[in-house]
C-alpha cells in the first residue's frame, strides 16, 4: 500500500524491513501472579535471586554472575574437512524442555538484574510520555475513499481508518487491537481494490511472519467469507475487475516446524472472491529454483500480470509477465537474467516503465515494450544522477522520483519524456515516505520525519508541485532544544562514510558524553533519519545518538551495497569500528561511555565487532541477530540471504563466514563489555536459536566480570507489529542497562 520510513514504521508499530523477503518480554514467569503455595514459592525464589543480584549490579564489580547452565551436547560438523563444534545445537529447538527451562532461568536472571537497577521506572515513564503522541501513516486514495493508519498515542497497534475526504470525519475500518488483549495481533499487509469498495488485509500473530489474509467490505465494515493462509511477506494484487486477487504462498508446514521451516517453493495463485482457498488457481511456480520468491503485480489499467522474481541477491531480480486478456496465455520472461534490479513503475498500453540499476548503479528510469522487450527497444527516460534513486511512481502524466542524497530524502517531478523536471522542496534533513498513487490522481501523499523532526503527512499537488501539511504529530517535548548534523569520516581503507549525530544543542566535546552508535549495513537497505521516541529519550538522558551509514546498504547505490556483502563483509565491520574511533578521537565520547546497538543484520554487526574489538566499547546490545553464519540458511527465510552472505556449503564462502561469524569467533578468556542480547520466542525470520547459542557461548567465554545477559521476549517475533507496551518495556530495560554500564548520572 505505501512506503513507510523507518521512524514511521516504529511509531506505527506495523512495519519492519530488516531481513524480510526482498520486496524487499517480559516473560510470563517474571510478572505472573500465581495462586496460593505456587505464588509463595515463586516470590521466595525471586527474592533469593534478587538478593544475589544486588551483589553485582555495578558493571565493574569483581563478582561474576552465576549463569544458568545451558543444555550441551557433543555435536561436531564437518565443513570441507574442517571440524566445527556446535555444543549448543539443542538450543535451536525452542520447544525442547531443556531449552524452555534454560530460557526461563536466563529471563529470571536478566529481569532480576534489571529490576534492581535504579531509574528504570523513571525511564519507562519518560518513554511512555514520549510515545504518547498521535501518529498517522500510509495515506492512499482508492475509488472515492482515503485510507490511512492512525494511532491515538499508546495503542498497541495502529488502526486503519477510511474517509471520503481529507477534511471529513474518518471511521475505523480495521482495529487489530480488538483481536487480542495483549496487542500481539498486527496488520502486516493491506491492499484496497481498484474501486475502493473492498479491502484485503493480512494479520500476523505474536510477531510471526506467517500471515492470514481476509477481505473487508468498506461500506459495511464486514468481512467476506474469504480466508487466505500460509503467506509470508506476500503482497496481494487485485485483478482488473476486482473479482479476485493474485498472491503468493508456501506449503503448510508441520506444527512443530512453524518457527524453523525453510521458506521454499513459493507459488503464485489467483483467488476468486467467494471461493475456498483450496479452489485457487495455480499461476506460476519454479520447482527448479525452490529458494526463489515470486510476487505478483497487476498494474493499474493494465492487461498484464507482472511477476517480480527474487533469486536471492538483494537489488537483483527477474521479471516475467502474462497477458490476462489473451486466451490460454502463457507466462513469458521479460527480464531473463537477474544481473540488476528492475522495479515496475507503471504500464501504459504495452509500455512498461521501470526503475533499474541496469547500466546505472545509482538507478535510472527506462521504458520497454512488453510485446517486444528486447534491449534494443529500450528507451531511457531519466538517466542516472549523482543521487541514488530509491523509488518511483506515476500519476497525472508525471513521474515522481524519490532520491537519497547523502542518506536523506530528495524528490523530483519529471515529465514522461524526461525532458522537464522540478524539485520537490523537503522540510529538512529527514526521510520522505511516499504512499501509492493512481495514474489519474492529481495528488500524492508522503510522510516526513527526522531524528529531531516530528512526523507530518503532506499532500503534494501534482499540478503546482507544492506541498501542504494535512496531518501533524505533536510530541510531548520541545524538539528545538535538539539538533541533528551530518559528518563524514574515513574508514580503514579510506572510504568516506556519512554519519548522523543527534543530541541536545550546545554539546560539550569533552569525551564524556554517553553515546549510542547504531548501524545496519546490509541487504541494500539504507538507514535514513526517522523520528523515534526512544532516540529522543536517549537525548533527554544526556546522550548522543550516532547513526552510521556504513557500506552494505543502498545509500550510494548498488556499488555501496556490493562493497559490504559476501567476501567484502569485513568492510561493514571496519566502517563501524572507524565510526567508533572517530567519535572518540573527536571527543564526542570515550570507550567507557560508548555503547553499540544493532538489530537483525545489525545484530550480526554488533556480534562481529564485539569479537574483533571488545576493548573499544563500553557496552553492547545485539538484537535478534544472525549469529550462526554457518547454519543460517537452514531456517525460515535464511535461504534468501545466501546471495547476500554466501553459504557454508561453498568452500570459499565458508572461509569468509567462519572468519567473522559472531558465534564462532567468541574468544574464550576475553574481557567483553557489559552486553544485553535480545531476541523473541516467536521470531521465525531470525530464529531465536541464533541468540540463544550466542548467549550461552559468550557467557561461558567471558573472563571479566561485566554481565552478559539475554532477554527473551514472549509472544513476539522479529519486530514487525510489536505492541507499543512491549516496545516501551524493552527500551526501558535497555536504557537502564546502559545507564548502569556507562555510569550515567541520575
Task: List the model feature ranges, each with a label.
Residues 519-521, 679:
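The conserved beta1-alpha1 loop
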Residues 69, 82-90, 94-513, 523-541, ...:
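Peripheral, non-catalytic segments that deliver or gate enzyme domains
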Residues 534, 541, 547-746:
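Active-site-proximal cap/loop segments of hydrolase catalytic domains
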Residues 50-66:
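Bacterial Sec-dependent signal peptides at the C-terminal "C-region" and cleavage site
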Residues 3, 32-35, 39:
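Short, positively charged and aromatic/hydrophobic N-terminal segments
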Residues 514-518, 545, 675:
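Hydrophobic beta-strand anchors of alpha/beta hydrolase catalytic cores
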Residues 43-49:
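Sec-dependent signal peptide recognition
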